[in-house]
């Protein structure tokens, strides 16, 4: 029971020391697998760890946690003791080859080293993501909190020291490497800086459907076969150039160029142009008709004025003749009167 309580307290200490969020799917799977191993260790106490190995661990600061965990483990293990009275022939089973007890003995040291190395590896990344990014580095704006949480949860899959958990492959701008189960990770300072820049300038996949890179383009694949078959891509080549990225303010204001206008717009434009043409033609016809009418009226007026002048001239000539005739008539009347007077004087002597 000391070995079982040691494993339980060790995992609890690893959970407390890890700076990552344990609410992801990888954390739940690892805890479920750890529970399976603990159940196996309960029923295999004679074949478990020795007390010497359990006492020689490198956990001097966790005495209180080990004592409390051992008390709870005893209560859980000896709550029902009926299984201890059963007799079974265990010679048929080779538990060393079946459950890999050697791996279980070496698991605490490897888990401790991987936890320390990964904590040191991702500590500067968490500090840089918590800081405010400079305005010149991130052209898209502040990343949503959900992406940061996913990045913090994803590295926990590297810490699964179980034979049945899949390995995770990752790539950096300089080189690509695979993390084996329980292996140590050593990355220099030069390799950490490009990784932090990649976390800051990560393009969200919801910006545009055409710009979403595939798993091979991003340099991350889930299986070794797909990783070996795909060509190596760096984050600088997999991303689209900044000229092709739509600006956050101009993407909504400027619509896409369309190959053709909508039918309603073309019909209305044609109708408007036809109406304008008809109006212009009518205006020109009215102008020409008005000018012709004015010309006719002017010609008629000129003809009438000419005739009137001629008639006036004739009238004046006729008046002169009438005056002359009236004068002659008056002169003749006067002569006739004088002749009558002369004849009357001659008759009266």
Swiss-Prot record:
Pfam families: bZIP_1 (PF00170). Residues 304-332 are annotated as: Leucine-zipper. Residues 303-339 are annotated as: Interaction with GABBR1. The modification Phosphoserine is found at residues 214, 218, 223, 230, 234, 247, 251. Keywords: Acetylation, Activator, Biological rhythms, Cell membrane, Cytoplasm, Cytoskeleton, DNA-binding, Hydroxylation, Isopeptide bond, Membrane, Nucleus, Phosphoprotein, Repressor, Transcription, Transcription regulation, Ubl conjugation. A motif (BetaTrCP degron motif) lies at residues 214-223. Residues 49-75, 204-271, 279-298 are annotated as: Disordered. Disulfide bonds: none annotated. It is found in: Nucleus; Nucleus speckle; Cytoplasm; Cell membrane. Residues 278-298 are annotated as: Basic motif. The BetaTrCP degron motif promotes binding to BTRC when phosphorylated. This is Cyclic AMP-dependent transcription factor ATF-4. It comes from Mus musculus. The gene is Atf4.
């Amino acid at each position: 029971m000391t070995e079982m309580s040691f494993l339980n307290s060790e995992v609890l200490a690893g959970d407390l020391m890890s700076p990552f969020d344990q609410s992801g799917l990888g954390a739940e799977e690892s805890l479920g697998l750890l529970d399976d191993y603990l159940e196996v260790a309960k029923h295999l106490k004679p074949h478990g760890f020795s007390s010497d190995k359990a006492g020689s661990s490198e956990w001097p600061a966790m005495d209180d946690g080990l004592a409390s965990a051992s008390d709870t483990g005893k209560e859980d293990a000896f709550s029902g003791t009926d299984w201890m009275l059963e007799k079974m022939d265990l010679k048929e089973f080779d538990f060393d080859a079946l459950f890999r007890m050697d791996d279980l003995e070496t698991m605490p040291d490897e888990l401790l080293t991987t936890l320390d190395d990964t904590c040191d590896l991702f500590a500067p990344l968490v500090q840089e993501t918590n800081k405010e990014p400079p305005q010149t580095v991130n052209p898209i704006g502040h990343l949503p909190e959900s992406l940061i949480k996913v990045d913090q949860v994803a590295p926990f899959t590297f810490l699964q020291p179980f034979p049945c958990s899949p390995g995770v492959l990752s790539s950096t701008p300089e080189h690509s490497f695979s993390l084996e189960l329980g292996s140590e990770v050593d990355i220099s300072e030069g390799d950490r800086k490009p990784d932090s820049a990649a976390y800051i300038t990560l393009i969200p996949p919801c910006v545009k459907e055409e710009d979403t890179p595939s798993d091979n383009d991003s340099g991350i694949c889930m299986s070794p076969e797909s990783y070996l078959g795909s060509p190596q891509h760096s984050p600088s080549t997999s991303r689209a150039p900044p000229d092709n990225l739509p600006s956050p303010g101009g993407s909504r204001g400027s619509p896409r160029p369309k190959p053709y206008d909508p039918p309603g717009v073309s019909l209305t434009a044609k109708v408007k142009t036809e109406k304008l043409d008809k109006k212009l033609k009518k205006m020109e016809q009215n102008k020409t008709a008005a000018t012709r009418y004015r010309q006719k009226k002017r010609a008629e007026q000129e003809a009438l004025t000419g005739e009137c002048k001629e008639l006036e001239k004739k009238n004046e000539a006729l008046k002169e003749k009438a005056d002359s005739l009236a004068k002659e008539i008056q002169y003749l009347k006067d002569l006739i009167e004088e002749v009558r007077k002369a004849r009357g004087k001659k008759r009266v002597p």
